[in-house]
Design a protein with these regions (language model features):
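P-loop NTPase catalytic core of nucleic-acid-dependent motor ATPases
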Residues: 126-236
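Structural motif
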Residues: 1, 10-11, 130, 160-168, ...
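Short, well-ordered alpha-helical packing segments
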Residues: 4, 174-177, 207-211, 239-240, ...
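Modules that initiate DNA replication and primer synthesis
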Residues: 1-52
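Hydrophobic/aromatic-lined pockets within catalytic cores
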Residues: 7-11, 24, 159, 177-185, ...
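Feature primarily recognizes SF3-like P-loop helicase cores of small DNA viruses
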Residues: 111-133, 188-191, 217-220, 226-255, ...
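Short, hydrophobic/amphipathic alpha-helical patches that form generic packing surfaces
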Residues: 1-9, 18-19, 122-123, 137, ...
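N-terminal nucleic-acid engagement/recognition segments and initiation subdomains in replication
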Residues: 46-153, 160-167
Length: 335
């Protein structure tokens, strides 16, 4: 009976009475429940000597308790890696590599938990590890926009004579943010600002500054268009891709570049995967160059917002990223 199972599992008598009342639709007469449980506890033998759980269930519960007590885990949806940190520590989340895996196993053994590497891997590959979306975690914890136009301020840091630069940058910036939150899954952010100016104008620094510190890991200025599969995977892995030294892209790669700029989703096979899958695109593009003669496509260059800079970009002033992106969300949701 239930009371006997609880007795052999080592559950105190009062807890058995209380849990029985809470979880089962038994007669409302508490005295009857209490006397029944009391009778079993007085006559049964072997309190706590035999659990009603199997050895596998006990091990799974023991492992789950150890992992949650010692560590925090999360599955990064962008990097497709499991990240960890020690619980009650000030450490940042770091990827779980072979050394970390071995350390977790050894720490468990030191506590008497007979875990092996394969058990830890099975745990980390399961839904016991919550999914973490870096973009959503940043954007959906922002304060309300205070009404100050910080997107315009950011655009005005780039000195140029083009009167259309500020509204074009605003449109591109809003499109970049919209694709991060999945507002438009049928079209890509197919236009790219192209900053043109001499060296030391801090073009690359400005591009990197567009992402807040919390999302800097999802910025890259190293993309090789000759490796097409890797380039397509970058659309899912990164939020902002800077085509630094745009003039170095060869004419033979221009057709693929045009294709990838307007690709709304990625249909490819992940590394070590066995099947092709549809991956969500997050990435927007921006580009820089020191040379003016860049866009030689005779069919037109509507995908690039070419800006000839008249001076260096001001990167000395800090950016209020929370208000910058709060403004973007406000405009996207209400305009």
């Amino acid at each position: 009976c239930l009371a006997e199972h609880c007795f052999r599992a080592g559950i105190p008598e009062e807890d058995t009475v209380r849990w029985t009342k809470a979880h089962y639709r038994l007669p409302s007469d508490e005295l009857l429940i209490r006397e029944t449980v009391k009778s079993v506890y007085r006559t049964a033998k072997g309190f706590g000597k035999k659990s009603s759980l199997t050895a596998e269930q006990l091990f799974a519960m023991q492992m789950d308790e150890f992992m949650k007590r010692r560590y925090e885990f999360r599955y990064n949806a962008l990097t497709t890696e499991v990240e960890y940190r020690e619980r009650h520590s000030f450490n940042y989340f770091r990827p779980v590599d072979k050394r970390v895996l071995a350390s977790i196993t050894m720490n468990a053994m030191c506590e008497g938990v007979k875990m092996w590497d394969r058990d830890v891997i099975r745990y980390l590959d399961s839904d016991h590890v919550p999914i973490y979306h870096p973009v959503e975690d940043f954007l959906y914890h922002l304060p309300r926009w205070d009404g100050k136009d910080r997107i315009l301020e950011l655009a005005n840091r780039v000195p140029c004579d083009n009167p259309h630069w500020a509204p074009l940058f605003r449109r591109w910036f809003l499109s970049m943010t919209a694709h991060w939150i999945g507002m438009d899954k049928r079209h890509a952010n197919s236009t790219s600002p192209l900053l043109i100016g001499p060296q030391a104008y801090r073009k690359s620094t400005f591009c990197r500054m567009l992402l807040p510190p919390a999302l800097q890991a999802y910025y890259t200025d190293s993309i090789d268009f000759s490796r097409k599969r890797d380039a397509e995977l970058y659309l899912n892995r990164f939020l902002l891709i800077n085509m630094d030294e745009f003039d170095q892209i060869s004419p033979t790669q221009q057709a693929f570049l045009k294709h990838i700029l307007q690709k709304p989703v990625v249909n490819t096979r992940r590394p070590n995967a066995s099947a092709v899958e549809e991956l969500r695109r997050y990435a927007s593009f921006i580009a820089t160059s020191n040379h003016r003669d860049l866009l030689t496509d005779t069919s037109g260059s509507r995908r690039f917002i070419g800006i000839y800079m008249t001076g260096g970009i001001d990167v000395s002033r800090p950016i209020d990223y929370e208000q910058l992106y709060a403004q973007a969300l406000e405009l996207l949701y209400h305009n």
